[in-house]
Amino acid sequence: MNSIRTGMCTPVYKIGAPTILFRTYSSILTFVPKCEQTKDSDLLRLKEFIDKHNNICILTGAGISTESGIPDYRSEGVGLYAKSSRRPVLYKDFCGSDVIRRRYWARNYVGWPRFSSIEPNNTHKVLKKLEDAKKVRCIVTQNVDNLHAKAGSRKVIELHGTAFKVMCLNCDRRICRYSLQDILDRLNPNMTATSQMIRPDGDVDLSQEQVEEFVVPSCEACGGVLKPDIIFFGDNVPRQIVESVKYNVEHSDSLLILGSTLTTFSGYRIALQASNAGKPIAILNIGKTRADDLAKIKVEGRCGDVLSRISTMILTS
């Protein structure tokens, strides 16, 4: 395996001085778009695709994590864009503004206890079983939530980084996000917040007063600016990650796309590479994707439901 990257770090975080309250969702499926029951014929086609291939590159998107309670950006009626006028922070804005960085880290600090405690769902668990069964070459995930690693998958490439690490923009030093939470606890002992909705990258809404009073640390090694080790909108995927993905797609025998519309080019170009190389492509998603015309098989449905229904057949056949 070439340059597999995972964001797993050992949890050492304890909720300390801040009082952070979260309202319980009525269902973990709050952020999953409505869809019809997947047809048995489509289940069989997807099962046969996985049965036939033993070196699959799997590309996952935000649609697989909605079943764990993390919203995506674009799902009709339930995504962040449908529920809020707020948009994700741009890379240039984060780097260029102390005010924007303070707001980002304040929101991220309050959202972290819940975001970091979210558990893998059936999709992550089935992919781990497929990996154990030697069906998977690698999992390329566009998600930053660490859920593949939590499920036990080891062959993971984090295309857009991980929210579970923090990097210095000056010296490139990296620390575990749990360690930063301890530092933020000490710097902000009186922080109190209530939140209704977590964001795809783990932050929440706060009042202007709460943001203005929030203290953000600098890098302990050089005094530089700290940034989550994720690819913000407007940023570029590191070259070594791009090359790792290209290598693994080239040496795979197929591409399986799960829970992604492939709206961002960093994901879509993986489908293009596979198609140009003659690799068969299967897609499981709710709604249209940018690569539908490249796919040999397109199945509509919830990833966790569909994969759970066919996993026993796949793994025992």
Language-model-detected regions and their locations in the chain:
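Conserved catalytic core of sirtuin-type NAD+-dependent deacylases
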Residues: 1-317
